[in-house]
């Protein structure tokens, strides 16, 4: 579970970076009532990335870890792309 907690922290940190360091909007929602985890990144009100994990508490640990790693990697890729844009111009 420590690995999953670390991944949650990384995802939240990346969402915070998008929100305060860019003109992108981010949200991370963990809804215990609906048993889901949802991450979204938007630019100018249009979805750029979203991922939803339904039946969160019923997921096997390794599958959940795989999905959280995929989310973190996707957000890191978007962050890297944003940082490279000024260098390309």
Where are the regions a protein language model picked out?
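Short polybasic amphipathic segments
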Residues: 36-42
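Negatively charged, low-complexity tracts enriched in Asp/Glu with abundant Ser/Thr
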Residues: 1-34, 46-89
